[in-house]
């Protein structure tokens, strides 16, 4: 039988006072084979617990009263584990700086200890972070922010922010302060990036549905000392959808802060759509009959005014926009009439009514505002030696100024449409001719005889304005086209001198004399300072195809979209 030794430290346990129940150490299981008794070792900082056979009672254990530490039936491994626990406990006592006879002090007499050491708090942070990370990797959550809640707390503590959940302190009795955590708000920017929503999801985001907190499900939860009991989805008072959406997310609240019921045909999923409110679903889908109570709540709406679009129409619109985005790299050349025409061809129905056309326009605008749908980065159009990027094609949007890349590639498309008739000069030709004379551009036409063509097109770019020189070779006329109707007499003179020098070099003396210059005044005039490049491209196209100038300033938005498509297809629409 092993002899037990009990220390006589001043901080050891004393017999419990009146009203405190005795606490006994849990007995350990007996081993069949007794190991040889090791030499007893005294622990630093105190003695051993009482002998189980002595009949003494052990007071109730409170932090940091040491536990009974020796048992004859314990093995060496258990003793080592016990020593490690006691060492951790001693570190905890040292960290808290507890005075002697701490357990016998009253609650009101206990002084407030200092904050624990940094090592223990770091270990707690690491454990919390690893737990959240494992939950993020290996579990499927039914909430949008459940995993990131723990992770957000960990990040906030690492950054030194105030955390409402304090450590267990003897002064507070281990109670958790009931203060909402600032690091776990649903609108916190430290949360996960929102999923890429589909077309209906973008509509929900516009109506404020996406910003509402997710609906938790499951048993009652307690967080920060507050008890919260969720309502059942089947409860009519809860206002939640009675079915789980395909992506596993719960329904969300409407813009008024109340849970809204969606009609049966509105709970569809296109691209991670979380939920659909009743007001949006009524605008998008037909056949959703509102009850008398809902109609009474909405006296401003006309009776029987339902949505003219169904879910298959919305799905078709999204597929059309996806295909358009992949073909043209952006939705710049897209018009609502084009989408309406495709819908009419597919469904054999009329979509040109104001109500349906307005909803199609709303779908297009919502699709454009979705992340990643503005343009396709890396989209390029290559034709011969020309390469157009999205930055070049973006000059055709709105009232942007066209650059030289767009001008030169479109001119080559015009020239290749009627190659035997037209020759198009580069946009840098006139600038080089004006600064360096004929010697600077004499090699530009070494492989072509311009006097065998019928029409020469020379774009002129002076400062920030585009204009055009058109040369009728047979009639020996030089015509200046300017959408702002400015009279630039130097341009025709420079071109006339170039033609005379080229005639001498190519030995075409019949074209050396007889050139006349004109200014074309009865042409379409621009009303702004940004559409001069688009006017020049239309001048080139109509002159090459021998078409009259039937366009005006009001046609420029449509013509810009047409030029964009022609550049992407590398072919003019004749």
UniProtKB/Swiss-Prot annotation:
E.C. no: 3.4.22.-
Any single biological process term in GO: negative regulation of double-strand break repair via homologous recombination
Region (Protease): 386-543
Keyword Chaperone annotated: no
Keywords on record: Cytoplasm, Hydrolase, Nucleus, Phosphoprotein, Protease, Thiol protease, Ubl conjugation pathway
Modification sites for Phosphoserine: 54, 73, 75, 169, 181, 188, 212, 232
Localization per Swiss-Prot or TrEMBL: Nucleus, Nucleolus; Nucleus, Nucleoplasm; Cytoplasm
Motif interval(s): Nuclear localization signal: 125-128, 153-159
Region ranges (Disordered): 1-125, 161-181
Coiled coil feature spans: none
GO cellular component, one term: cytoplasm
Active site: 465, 482, 532
Family assignment from sequence similarity: Belongs to the peptidase C48 family.
Identification of the protein by name: Sentrin-specific protease 3
Record lineage: Eukaryota, Metazoa, Chordata, Craniata, Vertebrata
